[in-house]
Amino acid sequence: MLNNNYIALIMEINNCEGLSFLTWDMFDSPDLPNSGYKFMEREPVILLDNIIKRYRIIIKVVLGYVSKPYADKLRLVRSNSHRVGKAVKIRCVGTKKRLTLVRGLVQQGVHRIGVSNDYV
């Protein structure tokens, strides 16, 4: 039987796996712990981590992966990219910071970017 400290250590290692600044739990569905690590696509998260490393900006991930019950609660359509872990909603206040983030996303080859006053 595994020790609780060992399990916590493994979860902590997984939480940062492949990332420099972000952690996988930032992308968890609010109702399902560790879902960000299990269900998020690796590519968008790693791209975002590279942008943060390059431009030294701080972001707040508002929405990453969402489970079916949580998506139903938010009334997200069945084909919503958050349901399959391919989308990230980021709170980004300030024109300069927002433009820096969008520029970084475009330079990394992202084609689908939604921008509003406070979110990317």
Language model regions located:
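Long, low-complexity, intrinsically disordered polar/charged segments
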Residues: 3, 10, 24-25, 31, ...
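Extracytoplasmic cell-surface/polysaccharide-interacting catalytic and binding patches
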Residues: 1-54
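Generic structural signal for short, solvent-exposed loop/turn connectors between secondary structure elements
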Residues: 36-37, 56, 75-77, 92-94, ...
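Catalytic cores and adjacent binding grooves of peptidoglycan-active enzymes
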Residues: 80-86, 91-120
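Extended, low-complexity, intrinsically disordered C-terminal regulatory tails
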Residues: 45-76
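Helix N-cap and loop-to-helix transition residues
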Residues: 23, 41, 67, 94-97
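N-terminal start-of-chain detector that recognizes signal peptides
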Residues: 32-34, 59-65, 93-97
